[in-house]
Amino acid sequence: LSRGNPEVEAVLNRNIDYMSGPEWLAREVLKDRWVMAVAGTHGKTTTTAMLLWILEQAGFDAGYLVGGVPRDFPVSARLGRSDFFVIEADEYDSAFFDKRSKFIHYRPRTLILNNLEFDHADIFDSVEAIERQVHHLVRTVPSQGLIIRPALDPHLDNALALGRWTPIQDTAVGSEISRTADWRAELLAEDGSRFMVIHHEQPVATLSWSLTGQHNVRNALAAIAAARHVGVTPDHAVAALCRFSGVKRRMELLADIDGVRVYDDFAHHPTAIATTLEGLRRRVGDEPILALIEPRSNTMKQGVHRDRLLASAERADRVFWANLNGMDWLDTLVAGAGANGRHWIGRSVDELIGLVRDNLSRPCHIVIMSNGGFAGIHGQLVAELQRRSGQEPGPLEP
């Protein structure tokens, strides 16, 4: 709620006591609990769901709050009856009167810092401003707690260099660092669907699952490390993740129609677009990939990441950019890509579906990327594909 909202104005004018949602959560739900928080620019929802699933399989009745829909749970939040609470820790501001990041209120004992990049240009002026907020979060973690982070992340390095008083464990994939990481994954499948988990250079167990991408391998390592901090052995954590179903809107398969597979993904940042498409490319090999991308977040609509956008989708064979809001910079960007036939602009859902139809082959993988509803393109595209295959169009699963 913002200033100008009638309810906000009434509260202020009548001198009614008020607090932000994150502050209420800290006072009424998180107080006296072992808070396990997952923060970072990318992967928060998936990593939170992974950690929660590990604890669930280990018999913990943890409370939780996830900013998405974990497929292994019926709801996105519950109070729980144990001392533990798992929370997705968002860096967005708390309220119109409290511009600190939401996660400042949570006071975690176990903290996962997945990564740090510039985002939320509507409230942050620079990546340094986000680093400062992460530093404020780190200041709240007790000395007997634990911080888990990737070994290679310069912006997290900067945030932690501002001061920290808590032990750190780091994660790495393959041999990306010369020194030894506390947790490491050795890929046994190029697409990340199978890998060995290594702790202090000792093999723990092999994880085989339906997810792809090195970003999800990193997410898994962080979740395993966090679960160990509260007493779940790594081999039990790996066994749980082998049965992990994922999160809705994270490379969620919507339909498979005569060899055309349609996926829904929440990617709304160049890094997320790139890692998602890279994971799919490694799984499907040379099979064609069509990407439908809606730059919808405030940061994307402002064109903050325009210099990275085209390159972020280089693993797709054709990229259809949705310009549903008259973004001149996007038209200019795609026009400047030249006549290579890989990047196209669509100004309506009908036009975008037509572009897909004109570039369709079998087999084919279509990835729809947006952090919103994308004007209902998911159901309309699937219905069009069903009609073309002689099937009766039906509703997508909720």
Each language-model region and where it sits:
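Short, charged/polar "capping" segments at the starts of alpha-helices
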Residues: 1-5, 72-73, 153-158, 177-179, ...
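Phosphate-binding loop of NTP-binding sites
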Residues: 1-149, 155-166, 221, 227-230, ...
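Beta-strand->loop->alpha-helix junctions that form or flank phosphate-binding loops
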Residues: 19-26, 64-68, 163-190, 208-214, ...
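A generic local structural motif
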Residues: 22-25, 71-75, 97-101, 132-136, ...
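Short acidic-hydrophobic surface loop/beta-edge motif
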Residues: 77, 195, 253-257
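ATP-dependent carboxylate-amine ligase
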Residues: 135, 161-167, 202-206, 212-215, ...
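Acidic-glycine-rich active-site phosphate/pyrophosphate-binding loop
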Residues: 187-203
